[in-house]
Regions:
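Short, small/polar-rich motifs associated with maturation and membrane association
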Residues: 2-345, 350-352, 357-365, 398, ...
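Extracellular/periplasmic, surface-exposed regions of secreted and cell-surface proteins
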Residues: 136, 181, 275, 303-306, ...
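C-terminal extracellular loops and terminal segments
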Residues: 145-149, 719-726, 767-789, 836-848, ...
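Glycine-rich, aromatic-lined ligand/substrate-binding cores of catalytic
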Residues: 840-872
């Protein structure tokens, strides 16, 4: 049978006809719906989003709250606006509609976690900042601390860089010269579990308690702030399966440019000639050496990170559950550095009886950190004249005159031969029973358990390294076990009297006990290097260990009072007893009080769209810190030692006094005053918070002044409570909703200013700390900030001998050397001319995040930075010193080589007779920076695309972390440690990431 074929011309005509008729048919099926959107008071709502459900068809209301939209007569309108509940209205052919939006109480009364309870944000009288999972979900990092960096005012976070290492967190400045880390509380259990052990996908929210009115409930551990972490829980409804996968690439940023082999040989010749030594005759023509080896390029690599999480949650009216498992695998940007982590989270609650509810949380993680013996400093200093390996396959290294060929060991070989592994296992759990006596009275009892295990295993084989061989194989192992038990019992009372007076009360007790067991050993001389068992070691090099314990017993109470939601009062008190102190100073009391006035609730307050809510706050409280106190600091301590004693002059074991007893040692205390206000403007489109604080640490632990006749020196480890530190500053946060509707745009801004000063050290003599090349870099002294840099002030370079002769006596100085200022005008450059040369503490922390959304697309751009701080670039001591056989950065190509050639980079001279590399402002650099911290572009697929696959939600994201940095700092990255010293730090990485999220 012959098939009929339609002529092409007729086919084209039919297609055109259908194309013309189809829009007409669609238009015939649509109607124009007009209407107005109002709130419950009858006021029109301007800028509300009006969308046809299931489509991208929509508009926004005008200045009179009116709208007009062409849509299906049987469609559904979805009307939404910030601060109001979203309304769905079925059109049913109607052409005129009036939509009334009701206030969203959940949005207006966000609940924050404050310790032993929760509180509506509108009822807060203290300084609390919060972020949710939505604020961190797109950060392509392995550490929760990295994800929250810059997003909370008053909180400084410094990334360690190395995979698996914890960030450093400081809240409202450095409150002590000792440990000033905040207390971390996970699901109600205080813990020293690092944030790197948590899976970010399991975190529901994070609340930071900053002022004493909210931290005093934790008494002797609240002085440095409290970080409250709440993990996810199930909600009522059918089970939900969530799957997320993230794949990332990482590389180092701003790697210093180093000299090649030819450039180094030329520099070496200059160093030799200028110091009166003979240059290497083999380098008479440096250009013949070519480029040589770039050791930093050999050490660094492109890192890869994979992060996967699967969770399942759900529940009914009587029980809820959430369970998840996570796996992270990260190869660092430094060769041989690897990190792997498994996590498990299980949260559940059950209303077993009308008056009895049980809930539990389990957080488990197992991680492994591996690395060889990498050394960033050696890679910067190693000479480019050597290959990575010799022709026979052995590792190369310096061989010969060390003044020419150097003494820095091959920096790549140890990363492959030496082995270092740390295994950690963390188990944090709690079980809570909640008894409800009446609607207004409850009792909670929580048992918490926190177990941590760390196992370190280092193996170093013998090898004929040049210039110094490793002659003995060694293996070091250590086991560290920590167990903490917690039992909290407290009553919760919440009742409103006469419809105006609301009273909340929490009162109870807490008991905590910790034990720690540590053991380590090292054996040398292994018969077989490939058999690493300790039994294979022939020589016991060292063995040691200890067991310690501490306990804390506490009684605490908090009362909240509210009169008509206008006048608010919060008062807390906690009494702690710690085993770490002597009997007469074992107990401490920590009170606080704060008040707030919600002016916007007053009858006379204008009811308009400009100011929706205004609350003024003030508070004062005293908190404590025992973080810097050892478990037995109040007791005298002794060490065992061996001394020749007796007629036979044989060695006898004896006890040697190490520290004096101090039964009067007690807590460091922090008294803090806080005032602030919160404002909501323009129908909650603008929300602004401001806080000003004065934070004074007293009874800070400092070295005790002890008469030398006691047999102890003033520099021993005996401490007393006599120091004082002051921090004062302001915090601001601003959230704006700039656009709503089809195109959405929100902005978050934070800014923090802090000024730090030591008020008393119990000594007129400064403390000098942080020694580099046998010289102290950092000073602690009265009336200066903590950790200021202390050294000489430079004044250019001597251009000729006449300038040397007319300057103050400066031993070793010649033309081309650095000129140092004679600050005391005594005609001699010596230690008396040292002064404060820099402050590592930033004055300002700031950030800005912009989020835009359009038809399923979301774009987030996050900026973060600090200002007002200095960095001591200790790497440049060796890498621009031009005083030894180390490689240098290309900055030295602009060195002084004759009168007028440079006034900043000195001459190259071996041995450094003028001490050009002494601690001075030559190595102090501006640490301020503005970083494009994160850019994320994501797309949420339309639901109609996913229905057939039974996928509820699917999201694709592309992200880049640490995109670009504007800074004047010359090192790898301006984000160095809290002390501001940059020396051999693991580089901060730039991360490119692809993420997929599915919900079923």
């Amino acid at each position: 049978m012959q098939k009929y074929k339609m002529p092409i011309s007729r086919l084209r005509m039919m297609v055109c006809l259908i194309g013309m008729l189809l829009p007409m048919c669609m238009f015939a099926q649509q109607i124009t719906v007009q209407g107005v959107v109002k709130d419950q008071t009858g006021e029109t709502v301007i800028g509300a989003s009006v969308m046809e459900k299931g489509t991208t068809n929509g508009t926004i209301t005008g200045i009179d709250g009116d709208f007009s939209l062409n849509m299906s007569p049987n469609g559904t309108l979805v009307v939404s606006f910030v601060g109001y509940k979203t309304q769905e209205v079925q059109v049913k052919g109607q052409k005129q509609l009036q939509v009334v939006l009701s206030e969203d109480a959940e949005m207006l009364d966000e609940v924050v976690v404050i310790g032993y309870g929760t509180m509506k944000k509108s009822d807060l009288t203290g300084a609390v900042s919060s972020i949710g999972n939505k604020d961190i979900k797109d950060s392509p990092v392995s550490n929760l601390g990295q994800a929250i960096q810059g997003k909370i005012s008053g909180v400084q976070i410094v990334d360690a860089g190395k995979p698996g290492d914890n960030v450093s967190i400081k809240i409202r400045g450095l409150g002590s010269i000792n440990n000033c880390d905040p207390l971390v509380v996970i699901d109600g259990v205080p813990t020293d579990l690092g944030l790197s052990s948590l899976n970010m996908a399991d975190v529901e929210r994070l609340d930071v308690l900053k002022d004493a009115s909210v931290t005093a409930i934790y008494g002797s551990r609240g002085a440095n702030g409290v970080v409250m972490i709440t993990t996810k829980r199930g909600t009522e409804g059918k089970g939900k399966l969530a799957v997320s996968a993230n794949y990332s690439f990482q590389n180092a940023t701003n790697v210093p440019s180093l000299l090649n082999a030819a450039q180094y040989a030329e520099l070496s010749n200059d160093m030799m000639v200028n110091s009166g030594r003979n240059p290497n005759p083999e380098w008479a023509n440096p250009s013949e050496l070519g480029a040589g080896t770039d050791w930093m390029d050999e050490l660094l690599r492109t890192g890869v990170m994979q992060n996967y999480t699967v969770s399942y949650s759900g529940g009914n009216e009587k029980s809820h559950y959430y369970v998840s498992g996570g796996f992270l695998d990260q190869s660092g940007i430094v060769k041989s550095v690897n990190y792997r982590r498994f996590t498990f989270q299980s949260n559940s609650d059950a209303q077993v009886l009308k008056w009895l509810k049980f809930s539990n949380n389990i957080t488990f993680s197992a991680d492994t950190k591996k690395s060889g013996s990498y050394n960033i400093g050696d890679a910067l200093k190693a000479l480019p004249i050597y290959p990575v390996k010799n022709e026979d396959g052995s590792w190369s290294g310096p061989d010969g005159n060390s003044e020419w060929y150097g003494s820095t060991r091959n920096p790549i070989g140890p990363t492959e031969l030496n082995k270092s592994q740390t295994d950690g296992y963390n188990f944090l759990a709690n079980l809570t029973a909640e008894l409800t006596f009446t609607k207004w009275l409850k009792f909670k009892s929580t048992f918490g358990y926190d177990a941590k295990f760390w196992f370190i295993d280092n193996f170093t084989p013998k090898y004929n390294w040049k210039p110094t061989p490793t002659e003995e194989t060694s293996r070091y192992k250590s086991d560290n076990k920590s167990f903490t038990y917690l039992w909290d019992n407290y009553f919760l009372f919440d009742h409103t009297f006469a419809e105006k007076h609301r009273v909340g009360l929490m009162a109870g007790m807490s008991a905590q006990w910790n034990t720690n067991d540590y053991l380590n050993a090292q054996k040398n001389v292994f018969m077989f290097d490939n058999v690493h068992e300790m039994d294979n070691g022939e020589e016991m090099y060292a063995i040691g260990g200890n067991e310690t314990e501490w306990a804390l017993l506490s009684y605490m109470a908090r009362v909240n009072y509210s009169y008509e939601d206008r006048y608010l009062l919060t008062a807390t008190i906690r009494r702690d007893g710690s085993s770490r102190f002597g009997k007469k100073h074992r107990w401490g009391t920590f009170p606080s009080v704060s008040v707030a006035w919600r002016a916007s609730q007053e009858k006379w307050f204008p009811k308009n769209d400009y100011i929706n809510d205004l609350k003024v706050r003030a508070g004062y409280g005293v908190t404590g810190s025992q973080a810097s106190v050892g478990n037995y600091s109040y007791l005298a301590s002794y060490n065992t030692s061996v001394y020749p004693f007796g007629i036979s002059s044989g060695n006898q074991t004896a006890l040697v006094s190490s520290t004096l007893a101090n039964p009067y040692i007690h807590w460091e205390e922090v008294a803090q005053t806080n005032i602030g206000f919160d404002a909501s403007l323009f129908n909650s489109r603008v929300m602004f918070s401001f806080d000003a604080y004065l934070k004074e640490t007293r009874d800070m632990l400092v070295k005790a002044s002890i008469p030398i006749t006691s047999g102890f020196e003033d520099t021993t480890t005996t401490y007393t409570n006599a120091g004082k530190v002051r921090n004062q500053g302001i915090e601001m946060s601003l959230h704006t909703i700039n656009l709503t509707g089809e195109l959405g745009w929100e902005t978050n801004l934070t800014a923090t200013y802090n000024k730090n000063k030591i008020k008393d050290l119990n000594s007129d003599v400064p403390y000098y700390i942080n020694q580099i090349n046998n010289s102290y870099v950092t000073m602690l002294t009265k009336d200066y900030p903590i950790n200021v840099f202390y050294g000489y002030v430079t004044d250019g370079i001597f251009q000729n001998q006449s300038e040397v002769n007319t300057h103050a006596v400066q031993p070793g100085a010649e033309p081309g050397d650095i000129r140092f200022r004679d600050l005391n005008n005594d005609g001699v450059i010596n230690d008396s001319d040292r002064t404060v040369i820099g402050n590592p503490n930033p004055s300002w922390l700031f950030s800005m995040n912009n989020s835009l959304s359009y038809k399923g697309f979301e774009l987030s751009v996050f900026l973060q930075g600090i200002a007002g701080n200095k960095i001591y670039n200790a790497n440049n001591i060796d890498n621009t010193g031009m005083a030894a056989a180390y490689n240098q950065t290309t900055d030295v190509l602009k060195r002084w080589q004759g009168e007028g050639t440079s006034n900043s980079m000195p001459r190259a001279v071996f041995g450094d007779p003028n001490q050009n590399t002494r601690v001075s402002d030559r190595f102090v650099e501006n640490g301020s920076y503005l970083r494009l911290k994160n850019i994320t572009l994501s797309y949420t697929f339309p639901k109609q695309w996913l229905q057939k696959a039974q996928i509820e939600n699917a999201r694709l994201s592309l992200s880049c972390e640490n995109v670009a940095t504007i800074t004047g700092y010359s090192g790898f990255d301006p984000e160095v440690g809290i002390n501001g010293i940059d020396q051999n730090r693991y580089p901060i990485s730039r991360t490119f990431s692809l993420g997929l999220n599915f919900n079923f």
